[in-house]
Amino acid sequence: MASLMLSLGSTSLLPREINKDKLKLGTSASNPFLKAKSFSRVTMTVAVKPSRFEGITMAPPDPILGVSEAFKADTNGMKLNLGVGAYRTEELQPYVLNVVKKAENLMLERGDNKEYLPIEGLAAFNKATAELLFGAGHPVIKEQRVATIQGLSGTGSLRLAAALIERYFPGAKVVISSPTWGNHKNIFNDAKVPWSEYRYYDPKTIGLDFEGMIADIKEAPEGSFILLHGCAHNPTGIDPTPEQWVKIADVIQEKNHIPFFDVAYQGFASGSLDEDAASVRLFAERGMEFFVAQSYSKNLGLYAERIGAINVVCSSADAATRVKSQLKRIARPMYSNPPVHGARIVANVVGDVTMFSEWKAEMEMMAGRIKTVRQELYDSLVSKDKSGKDWSFILKQIGMFSFTGLNKAQSDNMTDKWHVYMTKDGRISLAGLSLAKCEYLADAIIDSYHNVS
């Protein structure tokens, strides 16, 4: 119980039950646990106990989502938010796909309820997402060899898989590209799954270090999980060629590793759902067992709906059934069951021939706008930079991100001087850039590259 000290104009105002001698606790200056409050002629000093949470330290801001908070606080009219990977229109406004609006209207017309989904999610969604990934007639689907359950977008789906690895592959290591998406390491750390890195980005060429990648995958302990970006590598935008994917599959098979794909941009990288799934389908055709996490944040713009899936391709239908049962067991205490709204949107869009065609057209439009902006940025850099630097790496990258090659100090200059908000590894999201601001961004990049070391 907190102690009190009352200072009154007349001691006769003290309550009878309070002993005046017991009130001599000192002042707030001499006792750090006392706080003084004044009420007219009465001063009350309260002893406050230390918080039980004193040992909890302040967490650092998220390196990606924290960029948006800093951007919002900036009042400069030329500011650009190129940090978070979210699609914007040419006017730099959020975009809700027309086909998503149609799917939502359909749900309203039908009067869909808000009842709980099963632990594994919406059956129509799970069927649709597996078919989008592998193709409707693929043997893994026909033979029921893929365990698919709905997850909380890409992050939640990765986390489910990480928990499965921790439980059933004790001591196994996940090997991650260097660099990779900022949340990958957090997810495996949280699941207590050890990880290491394989070489991926070559700063000298601002391209793929393919030889280093292959060498490191070969050196990984046999049976490691090799985390691969299915398309539009984040943060570099650098993807292996089809021939290089074949070599990657060869090495993973030779070493008895388990591939683990993160597919966050299917259809959003090239504009084609099938082309962006080619790497995953290559591994499936070889009869390999592997994981695939999916997200619909980018290709359907369902960022806030948290809609995705984890797929585990197995060698038999029996194994897939058992894997699915354990994924459900993991999900139950973690979040119980997934949200229905986004799952119904995906199921409606994929299940309707007209809406599916409209979705593909909108994806092509979004991917096309990013390609146009990428070309315009390159053209602006070439025309403005008289140093002779080769900027062609920008055109060789794919998807919504570009790895500029800028270091932390140069990235800081982009923000501090030019009000261009980006992650400190030099990644920019071209989805947040307009044609009108390409020249301004080119000026910022040229200044930061040449004048900041």
UniProtKB/Swiss-Prot annotation:
Question: What is the protein's given name?
Answer: Aspartate aminotransferase, chloroplastic
InterPro entries, sorted? Aminotransferase_I/II_large, Asp_trans, NHTrfase_class1_PyrdxlP-BS, PyrdxlP-dep_Trfase, PyrdxlP-dep_Trfase_major, PyrdxlP-dep_Trfase_small
State the coiled-coil residue ranges: none
Give the reactions, separated by semicolons, that this protein catalyses. L-aspartate + 2-oxoglutarate = oxaloacetate + L-glutamate
Fill in the transit peptide range. Answer: 1-44
* Outcome of substituting residue 342 to E: In aat3-2; loss of function
Q: Which domain of life is it from?
A: Eukaryota
Where in the cell?
Plastid, Chloroplast; Plastid, Amyloplast
Complex and partners: Homodimer.
The keyword Transit peptide appears for this protein: yes
Keywords attached to this entry? Aminotransferase, Amyloplast, Chloroplast, Plastid, Pyridoxal phosphate, Transferase, Transit peptide
Residues engaged in binding L-aspartate: 85, 181, 234, 427
EC number of this enzyme: 2.6.1.1
What Gene3D superfamilies has UniProt attached to this entry?
Aspartate Aminotransferase, domain 1 (3.90.1150.10), Type I PLP-dependent aspartate aminotransferase-like (Major domain) (3.40.640.10)
Q: Which cofactor does it need?
A: pyridoxal 5'-phosphate
**A GO molecular function for this record?**
pyridoxal phosphate binding
The function of this protein is: Amino acid aminotransferase important for the metabolism of amino acids and Krebs-cycle related organic acids. No activity with D-Asp or D-Ala as amino donors. In plants, it is involved in nitrogen metabolism and in aspects of carbon and energy metabolism.
